[in-house]
């Protein structure tokens, strides 16, 4: 279930300030953030945001198709190494 329309999308204040500052300065450097729950807004298009996955910051380049999604959706937290084989092998 999504967030109520009267409340509007959630975005961390510090992240929004950094994005707006880069827009006014015409700067496109990487922005580090731990806010995985922030919603991607149209002002973020063209920026690269490094989203923390619990271990490292994963750079995410924001495109138009990402608007409305959360930043955490693009930085996976778990690594899938495949199913383990039997130790005994085939008999």
Curated annotation (Swiss-Prot):
<dbReference type="Pfam" id="PF00203">
    <property type="entry name" value="Ribosomal_S19"/>
</dbReference>
<protein>
    <recommendedName>
        <fullName>Small ribosomal subunit protein uS19</fullName>
    </recommendedName>
</protein>
<dbReference type="GO" id="GO:0003735">
    <property type="term" value="F:structural constituent of ribosome"/>
</dbReference>
<dbReference type="InterPro" id="IPR023575">
    <property type="entry name" value="Ribosomal_uS19_SF"/>
</dbReference>
<keyword id="KW-0694">RNA-binding</keyword>
<dbReference type="InterPro" id="IPR005732">
    <property type="entry name" value="Ribosomal_uS19_bac-type"/>
</dbReference>
<keyword id="KW-0699">rRNA-binding</keyword>
<dbReference type="InterPro" id="IPR002222">
    <property type="entry name" value="Ribosomal_uS19"/>
</dbReference>
<dbReference type="GO" id="GO:0006412">
    <property type="term" value="P:translation"/>
</dbReference>
<comment type="function">
    <text>Protein S19 forms a complex with S13 that binds strongly to the 16S ribosomal RNA.</text>
</comment>
<dbReference type="GO" id="GO:0019843">
    <property type="term" value="F:rRNA binding"/>
</dbReference>
<keyword id="KW-0689">Ribosomal protein</keyword>
<dbReference type="GO" id="GO:0015935">
    <property type="term" value="C:small ribosomal subunit"/>
</dbReference>
<comment type="similarity">
    <text>Belongs to the universal ribosomal protein uS19 family.</text>
</comment>
<keyword id="KW-0687">Ribonucleoprotein</keyword>
<dbReference type="InterPro" id="IPR020934">
    <property type="entry name" value="Ribosomal_uS19_CS"/>
</dbReference>
<dbReference type="GO" id="GO:0000028">
    <property type="term" value="P:ribosomal small subunit assembly"/>
</dbReference>
<dbReference type="GO" id="GO:0005737">
    <property type="term" value="C:cytoplasm"/>
</dbReference>
